[in-house]
């Protein structure tokens, strides 16, 4: 896990990489086909639906429900996909995150491991805090890590 801050202290980036046992395409596809996430990791993702466009097409808008620190929270975001690089970018525009951040982008990149067994899952959180009192979103990176590990368990069990 790495953290870098922008010059102003308001802008920053958090990066996390986790090794998983599952195939990179399988891991990427469950995130792309987001409707399966609430049944795969219901203790983290409580709902996921496309509200504009087709949910697997770049430019679609999705609404998410998720659990964080014992609370049910929501967000609305625009999603872009790059199937070739197995990259998904969520640009959050509405919801609970916007109470602390002017900008919040969560990028997921899934790469196959060089040995052909398993994958590397990378989350990149780019953010701009509303003010100095807004927290660095390390707790959201921890949530991403938990989702990665739990989804790995789910996907490997369903093989």
From Swiss-Prot:
Q: What GO biological process terms are annotated to this protein in UniProt?
A: defense response
Q: In which tissues is it expressed?
A: Laticifer.
Q: What is its main location?
A: other
Q: Answer yes or no on keyword Transferase.
A: no
State the source organism's domain of life.
Eukaryota
Q: Which residues cross the membrane?
A: none
InterPro entries, sorted: Bet_v_I/MLP, MLP-like, START-like_dom_sf
Q: Write down any Gene Ontology CC term.
A: cytoplasmic vesicle
Keyword Plastid on entry:
no
List localization entries: Vacuole; Cytoplasmic vesicle
Which UniProt key words apply to this protein?
Cytoplasmic vesicle, Vacuole
Protein family: Belongs to the MLP family.
- Which PANTHER family does the UniProt entry name for this protein? POLYKETIDE CYCLASE/DEHYDRASE AND LIPID TRANSPORT SUPERFAMILY PROTEIN (PTHR31338), POLYKETIDE CYCLASE_DEHYDRASE AND LIPID TRANSPORT SUPERFAMILY PROTEIN (PTHR31338:SF16)
Task of the protein: Not known; MLPs constitute up to 50% of the soluble latex protein.
Question: What is this protein's record name?
Answer: Major latex protein 149
Annotated organism of origin: Papaver somniferum
